[in-house]
Amino acid sequence: MGKAIHFGGGNIGRGFVGEFLHEAGYEVVFVDVVDDLITSIQNTPSYEITEISEDGEKTKKITNYRALNSKSHEADVVQEIATADIVTCAVGPRVLQFIAPVIAKGLESRNVSTPLTVIACENAINATDTLRGHIEKKTKPEIISERAVFANCAIDRIVPNQPPNNGLNVRIEKYWEWVVEQTPFKEKGVAHPNVSAIHWVDKLDPYIERKLFTVNTGHATTAYYGHLAGKKTIADALHDPKIRENVHKVLDETASLIINKHGISEQEQKEYVDKIISRISNPYLEDGVERVGRAPLRKLSRNERFIGPASQLAERGLKFDALLGAIEQALRFQNVEGDEESKELAKILKEKTAEEATSELTELEKDHPLYSHVLERVRTVQQESK
């Protein structure tokens, strides 16, 4: 039986990655810095995952796990990594830099011949490469090249707002996709982990961009239009014909990029879009627009779900008007209770000039063909609050 270390004991960690590592026969060690969460995991011998679909619900029991607090027990985490088979994480792209030092120490402490598999399960393009970059700053190059295999992945599974008093149990969408590149393992001449839930591919880029620019773009577009319209859930928002039309227009534009760039057929992409719309329309998920819309600063950043596809479309001379509309709605997601980034967004738009705000939020160069169009939308939103 192997051992997996997973950074991030939240709903994605327990309800997606943890589930599939458990089913693959691994003992899972959850690592987090939230004291109450770690204590709860340590004191709870099992938890349930309820998969939700329009056909009903199915419950699974998860066991054979432990938990460690990397803040107070870093040395223990280092020793666990030193003897682990796989390290995964679901902590958010901006937290990767903070987990890198302990992973670096764990690699330095390894004396097993098989390299450690490292997979960052984040909603970001090539997040494992990002994590590797942070680890490289903390240890010698030969430690990384000899003792680890880093593989990027694309993940897709909706984890809605959880009911109160749900404990460690997780309600989660039945549908899932976990695609991981196998090339790094081939290059090292080692076998990839035997996790049946993972779809191993040679070329990951099409999967990452298709997922990010369809699922995440469509989901967030629905949330931002829905928020402005006073809708409570994603399903409610998509029942509004005007919002549904706007979402389809956005996904038509991202589809044109995916088809043009990756050679995916128009019919295949259309079926993928239809499946995504059906999934996020599922009323049984009870997925709140504020949950999906949270962290607007990250979602408006350069390589994310709006500026990412819009910038590439602009560079190719293709249409991006609907994406501009979604960007404008995202700019209006301000001062939402419980979301610090929405408050910071309001502050930036209030205190900075339109040019300063556009550059800070999007990281676009001023001579980029998208820049002036986003600048115009920033000005529009700023003028509304004057």
From Swiss-Prot:
Gene Ontology molecular-function annotations: mannitol-1-phosphate 5-dehydrogenase activity
Pfam families tied to this protein: Mannitol_dh, Mannitol_dh_C
This protein's GO CC annotations: cytosol; extracellular region
Alphabetized UniProt keyword annotations: NAD, Oxidoreductase
Annotated InterPro entries: 6-PGluconate_DH-like_C_sf, 6PGD_dom2, Mannitol_1_phos_5_DH, Mannitol_DH, Mannitol_DH_C, Mannitol_DH_N, NAD(P)-bd_dom_sf
Enzyme Commission no: 1.1.1.17
Domain of life of the organism encoding this protein: Eukaryota
Catalytic reactions of this protein: D-mannitol 1-phosphate + NAD(+) = beta-D-fructose 6-phosphate + NADH + H(+)
SUPFAM superfamilies referenced in this protein's UniProt entry, alphabetically: 6-phosphogluconate dehydrogenase C-terminal domain-like (SSF48179), NAD(P)-binding Rossmann-fold domains (SSF51735)
A single BP term in Gene Ontology: mannitol catabolic process
Residues that hold NAD(+) according to the record: A4, I5, H6, F7, G8, G9, G10, N11, I12, G13, R14, G15
Active site: K211
Record note on quaternary structure: Monomer.
Function of the molecule: Catalyzes the NAD(H)-dependent interconversion of D-fructose 6-phosphate and D-mannitol 1-phosphate in the mannitol metabolic pathway.
Sequence similarity: Belongs to the mannitol dehydrogenase family.
Protein name: Mannitol-1-phosphate 5-dehydrogenase
Gene: mpdA
